[in-house]
Amino acid sequence: WKVKDAGQKELLYRHFRARGWYALIEVPVYNRGGESGNKYQITDIDVFALRPSPDLRWEAVIGDCKTKKGESPANRVLWARALMDQFGATSGIVLLRRDPKKAIEPDHKLFAQKLGIALIEEPDFEVYDRAMLYPSGSKTTSESAAALQSIRMGTCERFPKLSPLYDYIKERAWNEPDHFMLLRNSIGHGLKVRSEIDPGRDDHLAFVLEAAGVFAVALATCVGIVFHQYLQTNQRQALDGALKTIMWGGREQYDYISGIWAKLVEAKGGAEEHRDVSLPAWNTFLQLVRSHTDAPHFSFQIPQLLRVAALDIMGSRPFLASLGSPDPMLLKLGMLTASYYIEACRLPLDAKTRVKELFGRRIATVAIGASSAAPLVSAERVPTTAASISLPPPPTINSGSSSPIEAVTEATSLRGGDGPAQASGVSSSGTVGTAQTALPGIADPSRNR
């Protein structure tokens, strides 16, 4: 992994991940609605993070790195502040390498602090890191930016036909105007590579889980809004209407787009069931959102959880062993989220089977209180003959006089056609919740500031 300022980016990435935030390296910045059709890269963000907030929202954090010793600290602060404004970020860190004889002036640091930015010299970062992550700092975390690149860029280099999904989750996703476009577009680009995924390959499954983590970022935003609006509704019609309104920017907008889409499908002779702009496997999606509202703060830990899962699979390590004894509900929601993404993208069924077996065995280990004694499941390969795991049933959503929405199952059929799932969509100022337990690389709300 050879990039400019790689050492500083590694420091910030590890620090952000050790604090339980969802972190990314080198996020491109495009001018939304520009003359170049959103294809011209203006600059990039060295390290970009999303952290959970107590009120079920995502808060964006900008990390800027500079090894050029003659760089003006105030100029870098203003640069980072502009990126914060563009992405709706709440805070930032500027990490500079300075000439030992020319330390950063205190007024520069005070100026940065007023703009919501921590201005830190590279030699001092270890002190900052150990203080914010007392007492050991982030060096104990097993994650690295290089490992993340091996899942994303490394897999795509070996399998170029996966590039449509890779390009989206690396570049376009974080320049979308809102998280609801991300929700739709992450599935749409997954559909484009569905015939290229081999669930028997660890690198392919890890790549799918990483993509599912991007989807989960937007899902968390959606769950946060629905929870504040309805808490834990069991009425299908209410949840259905709320989600369609939220995802399309209002009921009028939904009706307008839905009407146009229905006419297009009808003109092409499409089936009646394809004339709806809802996500693929819509009933399963409704059930997924309802399940998340039972513990909405966990929704903002799922992207981080799926990142850890992907790294464990890629590295052939015991599955989620680094988390110790996580809450079974967190694991269950992670399994349901990844399973839905695989189903919605119409990926091979074996991918969902393998994901459910990995999570199911880990849930069973935690549930029986034998995490430290029972052998951990290897992420390299799980036998397909694994015994079924008994999990608490998902909440039932009632539709008045109608039957409840079907629960997530092993073989729920998908509606045909890619449909509107290929439409675009995601912003950097979504929604997140706090964790109730501190898990490595997942979330610790006491360290969110």
Spans of model-derived segments:
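Acidic/glycine-enriched edge-of-secondary-structure segments
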Residues: 31-41, 57-72
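Charge-dense, extended regions
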Residues: 264-449
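Active-site beta-strand-loop-beta-strand hairpin of nuclease catalytic cores
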Residues: 50-62, 256
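Catalytic cores of nucleic-acid endonucleases
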Residues: 60, 65-123, 285
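Long, charge-rich C-terminal accessory regions
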Residues: 164-330
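Acidic-basic catalytic patches of nuclease active cores, encompassing PD-(D/E)XK
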Residues: 1-42, 53
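Domain-level recognition of nuclease-like catalytic cores that cleave nucleotide substrates
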Residues: 98-165
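Glycine-rich, highly charged phosphate/nucleotide-binding loops
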Residues: 41-51, 73-78
